[in-house]
Design a protein with these regions (language model features):
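Nucleotide-activated sugar donor-binding and catalytic core shared by glycosyltransferases
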Residues: 1-311
């Protein structure tokens, strides 16, 4: 690390989240290079362990010039480990900014045309699904179509190499299916298989509701923010242990719903799809959440430039 720092001679070194390397910070300190931690977070369990080592770690944390923590709780934990109180702020989670990618209306129009999904068709999407989830989603879809005959399920598996297997599964459930990768459309189909890469976020914009996969089976889940950022009613299961803090924020804001079973998912989806009031309420909650939780990247950049790069 000393060789790297000497070779680059940085004006500022930025560490991210939990990547706090003692040797790196020590090398920076001895060369007069400011060290800043952005999007910092410390889980309660990690804090308990680190606090037992506080006498040894205090010089490390005191060496940090600035810390931008994700939450007020994280801010207090950093202070408890030795970061100078005036050097740590809680500005929010950078990940909230990273998911704001709103495609242009013309792009969404082209996507709707190429996929055959019209604006007046009721659509729900299963995003980043895993093996064991799709069969249950297809059963739910079959029941939902008893009330909404033209309802479309966009099925986006986490592993697109499972596409052929999923086509057979759809047919076993009596569902006609179109594949995105083959240039097929959703017209006349009850399921549209999104077996391509990089399009899931855009398809959330075409949906009326979204389920986030990897959560009703114990995989840890995928980030629900992507669907929430599209202002869609978003549902997930109990195993979202990879995104607990984000989950807590979303539930508190009322712009997502946690379900514990497929039966609960069916009930929640049925209520959402038949009620424009529920959809509008969750959309408003999502808008309010995004307005209060985004923008920290701009604030951090402004402070870094003002302190370390101003003339």
């Amino acid at each position: 690390m000393k060789i790297l720092v000497d070779g680059i001679r940085p004006n500022l070194f930025v560490l991210v989240e939990t990547d706090l390397w003692p040797n790196c910070v020590d090398a920076l300190k001895h060369r007069g290079v400011p060290a800043v931690l952005v999007n910092g977070r410390i889980s309660p369990g990690s804090f308990a362990r680190l606090r037992r080592l506080a006498p040894f770690l205090r010089p490390l944390y005191q060496s940090l010039d600035m810390v931008f923590a994700q939450s007020l709780e994280d801010r207090e934990r950093y202070r408890g480990l030795g970061v100078r109180p005036e050097c740590v702020q809680a500005l929010g989670n950078l990940k909230f900014d990273s998911i704001l990618k709103n495609p242009a209306a013309s792009e969404l129009s082209r996507l709707g045309e190429s996929s055959g999904i019209s604006g007046d068709r009721l659509v729900w999407i299963g995003g980043s699904t895993h093996e064991g989830e799709e069969e249950a989603l297809l059963e739910i879809h079959t029941h939902l179509r008893e009330r909404h005959r033209d309802l479309l399920l966009v099925l986006a598996p986490r592993r697109i190499e499972r596409a052929s297997q999923l086509v057979e599964l759809c047919r076993e459930h009596g569902c006609s299916v179109g594949r995105r990768s083959l240039g097929e459309t959703a017209q006349g189909k009850s399921v549209y298989l999104l077996d391509t890469l990089g399009e899931l976020s855009a398809f959330y914009h075409l949906a009326d509701a979204a389920f986030i996969g990897g959560i009703l089976v114990p995989f840890g889940g995928h980030n629900p923010l992507e669907a929430v950022a599209c202002l869609k009613p978003t549902f997930w299961g109990p195993h979202l242990f990879n995104f607990r803090e984000i989950e807590s924020s979303l539930l508190q804001a009322g712009c997502g719903q946690k379900v514990d079973t497929y039966s609960e998912l069916h009930t929640a989806l049925a209520a959402c799809l038949r009620s424009e009031t529920i959809q509008a309420k969750m959309k408003t909650s999502a808008q309010r959440f995004l307005s209060t939780h985004t923008g920290c990247s701009r604030q951090i950049a402004r402070q870094l430039v003002g302190r370390f790069f101003s003339a």
